[in-house]
């Protein structure tokens, strides 16, 4: 009789273990699918007015002109424009996942000073996200400013792209002329 009870419990345990381990779902759920970013819009405003610059994937030259001695507020927006009838704004997801993203402008030039804007979004640690920045056009000249959207950076401060770690979601070279 005791042997029958042990056998019964062993079979019950085996059956329960088998059902828990099996799954009909052969396609695992993607937890964080990477977005396609193929359009970047940069809105620049100052007391003298505003300009909007749009880059689309495949554009070979992205240039903007600024005036010396002027402070600019710069806002960056990312889009998936693969379907022209259904353009998807990526910024809401970047903001929602602020701890996992950072927008960085790599600037090795002395013609511009770039800082976080006070109205910029922040991550849970209070670090600026970089979607809104202030640019001061210090003097006449030209430079290439590199814009990066970084996914899962190791840090959110630095002077060059390599300081941040993580993966680059999108990079854009901006040819800036200050007159």
Residue spans for each PLM region:
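Bacterial Sec-dependent N-terminal signal peptides
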Residues: 3, 15-42
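First exposed extracellular module after export/assembly in secreted or surface-exposed proteins
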Residues: 29-179
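Bacterial N-terminal signal peptides that target proteins for export
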Residues: 1-10
């Amino acid at each position: 009789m005791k042997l029958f009870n042990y056998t019964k419990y062993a079979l019950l345990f085996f059956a329960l273990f088998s059902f828990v381990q099996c799954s009909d779902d052969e396609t695992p759920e993607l937890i964080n699918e990477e977005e396609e970013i193929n359009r970047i819009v940069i809105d620049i405003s100052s007391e003298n007015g505003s300009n909007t610059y749009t880059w689309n994937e495949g554009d070979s030259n992205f240039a903007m002109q600024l005036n010396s001695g002027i402070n600019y507020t710069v806002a960056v927006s990312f889009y998936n424009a693969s379907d022209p009838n259904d353009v998807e704004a990526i910024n809401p997801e970047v903001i929602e996942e602020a701890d996992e993203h950072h927008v960085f402008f790599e600037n090795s030039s002395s013609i511009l000073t770039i800082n976080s804007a006070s109205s910029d979004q922040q991550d849970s640690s209070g670090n600026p996200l970089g979607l809104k920045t202030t640019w001061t056009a210090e003097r006449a000249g030209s430079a290439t400013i590199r814009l990066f959207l970084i996914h899962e950076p190791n840090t959110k401060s630095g002077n060059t792209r390599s300081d941040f770690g993580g993966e680059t979601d999108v990079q854009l070279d901006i040819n800036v002329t200050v007159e």
